């Protein structure tokens, strides 16, 4: 079949973590096999690692369940983090003034597909 789907996607929206910090973790797994990517993420001491592992495992499950792809042949083809909505807060400061605090969020997307033989 020529139009057979060979990739699966998973995403996490509005994760309470800046996209800049998530990108540092995502850059480590792009282009790797899914087993290697999970091994890398489990030993990466960053707050974004557990979230990215969760999205990656979701993409693997989507590939197996929805498209009948073999998990051992999957590769992380695309992985990116875009900025989500920013939560704007204010911190009281001296003399009745206030400073803004931007609590940034991100949208994380991981695409896995089968290796070309």
From Swiss-Prot:
InterPro entries assigned to the protein according to its UniProt record, in alphabetical order: Ribosomal_uL22, Ribosomal_uL22_bac/chlpt-type, Ribosomal_uL22_bac/org-type, Ribosomal_uL22_CS, Ribosomal_uL22_sf
Record flagged with keyword Ribosomal protein: yes
An MF annotation (GO) of this entry: structural constituent of ribosome
Keywords recorded for this protein, A-Z: Ribonucleoprotein, Ribosomal protein, RNA-binding, rRNA-binding
Disulfide bonds: none
Annotated GO biological process: translation
KW Ribonucleoprotein (keyword) present: yes
Cellular component aspect of the GO annotation: cytosolic large ribosomal subunit
Subunit structure: Part of the 50S ribosomal subunit.
Family stated for the protein in its record: Belongs to the universal ribosomal protein uL22 family.
Function: This protein binds specifically to 23S rRNA; its binding is stimulated by other ribosomal proteins, e.g. L4, L17, and L20. It is important during the early stages of 50S assembly. It makes multiple contacts with different domains of the 23S rRNA in the assembled 50S subunit and ribosome.
Listed name of the protein: Large ribosomal subunit protein uL22
Originating species: Latilactobacillus sakei subsp. sakei (strain 23K)
Gene name as annotated: rplV
């Amino acid at each position: 079949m020529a139009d057979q789907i060979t990739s699966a996607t998973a995403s996490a929206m509005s994760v309470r973590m800046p996209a800049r910090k998530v990108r540092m973790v995502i850059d480590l797994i792009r282009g790797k096999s899914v087993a290697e990517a999970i091994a890398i993420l489990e030993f990466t001491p960053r707050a974004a690692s557990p979230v990215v592992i969760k999205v990656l495992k979701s993409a693997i499950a989507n590939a197996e369940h929805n498209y009948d792809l073999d998990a051992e042949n999957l590769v992380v083809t695309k992985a990116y983090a875009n900025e989500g909505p920013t939560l704007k807060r204010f911190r009281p400061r001296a003399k009745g003034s206030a400073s803004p605090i931007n609590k940034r969020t991100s949208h994380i997307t991981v695409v896995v597909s089968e290796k070309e033989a």
